């Protein structure tokens, strides 16, 4: 059974999405969630100081990649921290790095493990800043974890905000907790390309054994590139892949963050995507295909490469 099917079932019904290493000097206590009287006011100021990182639990989790690996569920997430202060972190000896790592045995109580990387990989920084006027490459976003044989592959992206100047890289380890070794670049884009190299999601086709990486956000739509299973890198160096999904007007009709999973009972691949502006009508939609690389169609059989809207809508602001 696919790793995600323990978490996600009946994919056209209401869906629950649970969605060198740089470790903390000692293990953190397991976080126990507490209810808030008003979730809109829940800003977790009580544990927002940099020295409180062992108490973060699920606080400061953005764009998580979660998978059952051995006895634990492991979760990796974007470098976005409420009240982040790297100067304060250095002064107080906080080992602040990049890509937060957590683990849990029940998906409720989470232990903060630390950060995967001590620094943003230099190759990614050079690519982004040299193509964005010295801007960008300040955080690592949207990591994705997947096992292969006796290794664990951690995909990640570095970008310049609001531009197509981006880089998706790969690190490997023999443990889901690291340490991580940089393996290289999968795809990189700039203002001259149609697509944007962020938000990777990787899957192996159950029938062909081929590996595919879906990626992209905003500009130009979502794309899919074939990977070499043995290396985890692009099968053909420099290949940016083929178009999978798009919308008509990216200034108002946003499309981002593909997530591809396989449903073994239905023998189909489901592509979850985020639609519309983050701060207003943000929502999640899903399409499906008989092949991991597509083509994908919506509930009504309409191709998601079409520029009109696709359905169904699974989640929306304050709705499920």
Label each residue range with its predicted role:
Residues 26-320:
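Carbohydrate-active catalytic/glycan-binding domains of CAZyme proteins
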Residues 1-34:
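Bacterial Sec-dependent N-terminal signal peptides
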């Amino acid at each position: 059974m696919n790793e995600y099917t323990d978490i996600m079932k009946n994919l056209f019904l209401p869906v629950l999405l649970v969605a060198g290493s740089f470790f903390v000097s000692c293990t953190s206590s397991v976080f126990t969630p507490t209810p808030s009287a008003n979730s809109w006011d829940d800003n977790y100021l009580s544990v927002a100081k940099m020295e409180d990182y062992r108490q973060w639990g699920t606080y400061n989790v953005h764009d998580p990649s979660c998978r059952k690996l051995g006895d634990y569920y492991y979760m990796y997430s974007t470098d976005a921290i409420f009240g982040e202060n790297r100067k304060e972190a250095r002064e107080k000896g906080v080992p602040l790095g990049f890509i937060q790592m957590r683990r849990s045995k029940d998906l409720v109580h989470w232990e903060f493990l630390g950060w995967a990387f001590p620094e943003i990989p230099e190759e990614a920084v050079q690519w982004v800043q040299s193509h964005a006027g010295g801007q960008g490459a300040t955080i690592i976003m949207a990591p994705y974890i997947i096992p292969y044989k006796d290794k664990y592959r951690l995909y990640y992206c570095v970008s310049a905000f609001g531009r197509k100047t981006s880089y998706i890289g790969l690190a490997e380890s023999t443990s889901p907790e690291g340490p991580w070794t940089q393996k290289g670049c999968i795809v990189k884009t700039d203002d001259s390309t149609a697509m944007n190299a962020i938000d990777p999601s990787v899957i192996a086709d159950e029938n062909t054994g081929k590996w595919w990486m879906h990626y992209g956000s905003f500009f130009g739509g979502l794309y899919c590139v074939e990977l070499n299973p043995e290396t985890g890198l692009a099968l053909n160096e420099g290949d940016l892949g083929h178009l999978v999904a798009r919308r008509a007007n990216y200034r108002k009709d946003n499309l981002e963050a593909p997530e591809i999973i396989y449903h073994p009972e239905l023998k189909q691949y489901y592509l979850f995507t985020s639609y519309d502006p983050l701060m207003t009508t943000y929502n999640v939609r899903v399409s499906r295909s008989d092949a991991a690389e597509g083509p994908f169609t919506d509930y009504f059989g309409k191709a998601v490469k079409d520029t009109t809207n696709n359905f169904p809508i699974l989640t929306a602001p304050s709705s499920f």
